[in-house]
Swiss-Prot record:
Its cofactor is [4Fe-4S] cluster. HAMAP family: NDH1_NuoI. It holds the Pfam family Fer4_9. [4Fe-4S] cluster 1 binds at residues 64, 67, 70, 114. The gene is ndhI. Keywords: 4Fe-4S, Chloroplast, Iron, Iron-sulfur, Membrane, Metal-binding, NAD, NADP, Plastid, Plastoquinone, Quinone, Repeat, Thylakoid, Translocase. The keyword Thylakoid applies. It comes from Nasturtium officinale. NDH shuttles electrons from NAD(P)H:plastoquinone, via FMN and iron-sulfur (Fe-S) centers, to quinones in the photosynthetic chain and possibly in a chloroplast respiratory chain. The immediate electron acceptor for the enzyme in this species is believed to be plastoquinone. Couples the redox reaction to proton translocation, and thus conserves the redox energy in a proton gradient. This is NAD(P)H-quinone oxidoreductase subunit I, chloroplastic. InterPro entries: 4Fe4S_Fe-S-bd (IPR017896), 4Fe4S_Fe_S_CS (IPR017900), NADH_quinone_OxRdtase_chainI (IPR010226), NDHI (IPR004497). Disulfide bonds: none annotated. NDH is composed of at least 16 different subunits, 5 of which are encoded in the nucleus. [4Fe-4S] cluster 2 binds at residues 74, 104, 107, 110.
Length: 167
């Protein structure tokens, strides 16, 4: 009779333990119901990038002194800097500046080490194209500032998306 009673007690303990484990899992599932969705519908919704996001490089032609520090610190020697030495004033004059974003690894070394801060990172990250030669940006294309995701009325960002109603 005693083994039968201990068997019932063990069975009851195992049943309670299983119910507790199922309850814990259910509570975790319920705790996730009040969260916002993580997945976004990309072309129509975009995440707002952080301040330190390393997107397309913005170039200010007037600030550049053609020192070529950006070329020396680039791990793949990417920026192409064409300059001409002005003998009468003994300074370099920048003629052309270009970066091929098909090759760029967006490490940010050129921006970090530029002595005149003529390079900066923007929040633009959409470079899709059918021709790889379109990714070679000259100083005119690098000088254009991109439209901010927050200011673009055609894109619904996470900040202005409708919140879930608890109820």
């Amino acid at each position: 009779m005693l083994p039968m009673i201990t068997g019932f007690i063990n069975y009851g303990q195992q049943t309670l333990r299983a119910a507790r484990y199922i309850g814990q899992g259910f509570m975790i599932t319920l705790s996730h119901t009040n969260r916002l969705p993580v997945t976004i519908q990309y072309p129509y919704e975009k995440l707002i990038t952080s301040e330190r996001f390393r997107g397309r490089i913005h170039f200010e032609f007037d600030k550049c002194i053609a020192c070529e520090v950006c070329v020396r610190v680039c791990p793949i020697d990417l920026p192409v800097v064409d300059w001409k030495l002005e003998t009468n004033i003994r300074k370099k004059r920048l003629l052309n500046y270009s970066i091929d974003f098909g090759i760029c690894i967006f490490c940010g070394n050129c921006v970090e080490y530029c002595p005149t801060n003529c390079l900066s990172m923007t929040e633009e990250y959409e470079f899709s194209t059918y021709d790889r030669h379109e990714l070679n940006y000259n100083q005119i294309a690098l000088g254009r500032l991109p439209m901010s995701v927050i200011d673009d009325y055609t894109i619904r960002t996470i900040l202005n998306s409708p919140q879930r109603i608890n109820g």
